[in-house]
UniProtKB/Swiss-Prot annotation:
Family as reported in the entry's similarity comment: Belongs to the SCAMP family. SCAMP5 subfamily.
Extracellular side: 61-67, 126-148
Protein name: Secretory carrier-associated membrane protein 5
GO molecular function, one term: protein-containing complex binding
Keyword Chaperone listed: no
A GO cellular component annotation in the UniProt record: synaptic vesicle membrane
Keyword Transport: yes
Keywords: Cell membrane, Cytoplasmic vesicle, Endosome, Exocytosis, Golgi apparatus, Membrane, Protein transport, Synapse, Transmembrane, Transmembrane helix, Transport
Membrane-spanning ranges: 40-60, 68-88, 103-125, 149-169
Superkingdom, natural source: Eukaryota
Length: 235
């Protein structure tokens, strides 16, 4: 079996760094979980883009007469939250759907709830916190309308991220509870060390993929058991 080579993030060749993770949705994720996993990945991308747009909004805030603190913090949030959100909540849910790991699901719930709280705070927009939220944007309309209009763009995006994050958390929680997952199951994985055993993870992945393949082939198997009748042409 060929060794999997890390391919994410896809860095340009002139950067003297190598990708840190291997990511292949079609190869790793069972078909029944593929759509939800990709949606969570797109949510991470939207959050990263929003942080970049927020940096532009804070630059307009600075040019319009705001303090430099917000711009500095916006830059810090961009370089900090983009990789941390990928490592802390997307990789756990990717691994959870890949290996059906309750421990990974619990890690996702813990970190993603923190992500949801952060998204709400960003949408609110407390002045001096480096985010163009509603409070900061609305209050700046009286100072510089042009800058406030630019600030309104990341404000709306932060709001969308917060709403989508709540929906995503609800969807994953509903799936996890419906599949029989529980906190005690995650504790059992932690105690036995199954969450970090590559052989157990591979077996779980193969079982999940096999179950998905069996579900897809079930109608074909059902029809294959129908008796075949042959008739002789001789009279």
């Amino acid at each position: 079996m060929a060794e999997k080579v890390n391919n994410f993030p896809p860095l340009p060749k002139f950067i003297p760094l190598k990708p840190c993770f291997y990511q292949d949705f079609e190869a790793d994720i069972p078909p029944q979980h593929l759509s939800l996993t990709k949606r969570l990945y797109y949510l991470w991308m939207l959050n990263s883009v929003t942080l970049a747009v927020n940096l532009v909004g804070c630059l307009a805030w600075l040019i319009g007469g705001g303090g430099a603190t917000n711009f500095g913090l916006a830059f810090l949030w961009l370089i900090l939250f983009t990789p941390c959100s990928y490592v802390c909540w997307f990789r756990p849910i990717y691994k959870a759907f890949k290996t059906d790991s309750s421990f990974s699901f619990m890690a996702f719930f813990f970190t993603f709830m923190a992500q949801l709280v952060i998204s709400i705070i960003q949408a609110v927009g407390i002045p001096g916190w480096g985010v163009c939220g509603w409070i900061a944007t609305i209050s700046f309309f009286g100072t510089n309308i042009g800058s406030a209009v630019v600030m309104l763009i990341p404000t709306v995006m932060f709001t969308v991220v917060a709403v989508f994050s709540f929906i995503a958390l609800s969807m994953v929680h509903k799936f996890y509870r419906g599949s029989g997952g529980s906190f005690s199951k995650a504790q059992e994985e932690w105690t036995t060390g199954a969450w970090k055993n590559p052989h157990v993870q591979q077996a779980a992945q193969n079982a999940a993929m096999g179950a998905a393949q069996g579900a897809m082939n079930q109608p074909q198997t059902q029809y294959s058991t129908t008796p075949n009748y042959t008739y002789s042409n001789e009279m």
